[in-house]
Amino acid sequence: SALRQFDEIYVDKTELIYDLASQKSKYFFVRPRRFGKSLLISTFESLFKYGLKELRGLAIEGLYKNETKYLVVKLDFSEAKYFSSPEEFSERLASLIVRNFSRVGFSYVPGSAESIFYQWSEWLKTLDSNSLVVLVDEYDSPLTYCLGQEELFAAVRDCLLYTSDAADDLI
């Protein structure tokens, strides 16, 4: 909406966004750097959080009839890319999850016997089906950051896979 508000060039691809948003599926977009992934994610965020409010005058306005407002969490993994050990990465990832999911009702209890990831997965189970949209940007940032550091790369990859597997059935 800011692009259009300031008369910047904006190519309306919201008809394609409608096609994707109309299906209850998980999508993984791999595109080159500077290829519009963040703008695409922001458009989805606006659609699922506010409906058509910020998309008036675009193709999607005449197509999208769903008036449901969703809980929307946007995770930007570039916020967790500076670390020197697997433990530090795990802490940064946990902080990213707590910070972003607390905006939609997740409450982490520090000092509890249960880990952050366990508490988070238990909280996810309490949500109504199809009530949460999770958008991930810069998913590869932590891995790119530690390229060339074989052991650290493997540990970060495993942590990301474990976290995504734990959440996969719940989201």
Predicted features, each with a name:
Residues 143-153:
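Conserved ATPase-coupling elements of RecA-like P-loop NTPase cores
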Residues 141-144, 169:
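Residues immediately C-terminal
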Residues 162-171:
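Single conserved hydrophobic/aromatic residue that forms the stacking wall/gate
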Residues 22-23, 68-69, 127-130:
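Short loop/turn elements that form and flank the Walker-type P-loop nucleotide-binding site
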